[in-house]
Amino acid sequence: MRRRLAGCLATAQMASCLFPPNLSDGPTNLPLAEDIEKNPTVFGELLRGEAPIRKLHECEAYLSFRNVKNYAPLAGLVIPKRRRPQDPDGLRKVDVSLLEDMRRVALEVCQREQPEAFAANDYWLRFHRRPWHSVDHLHLHVLAPASKVSSWTAFIFLAGSPWSLDADALLEKLRRSRE
């Protein structure tokens, strides 16, 4: 066991060794209300109204709210109400419409909350990769203005790093994929 763990930690595949994908973690066939009721994450608590929230947007399928961590003047999150694991690398071509919708909500929030940053393209839309996330429910970070973030925030949201993925890059990759 010790040798296997050391091997996992020594490779670029650390996340998949420590947190293998759960093949049952795709969208459920449960009614949305039941899916929300069974959601064990803090986002499930927010969706059920069990914890305070500063909503930025809500519609039938998505919720956007302010992050409790103030990474930027606008530090928002966009989540699908139906729980999906926080595994952007595990998403497939069939998930393009989900990501397009999440991106659209994030851009609407950015345009409303930080219009100057939006007009100047001074914003980031990022996913954290496994295992570098704190809530295992798919969520997209919207940060604006990006020019105002700290150097630490810039590091933890560095697009293309082993821990962070740009939403547009992910969408482009999925659109080009064959599966």
Where do the language-model regions lie?
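HIT superfamily nucleotide-processing domains
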Residues: 2-179
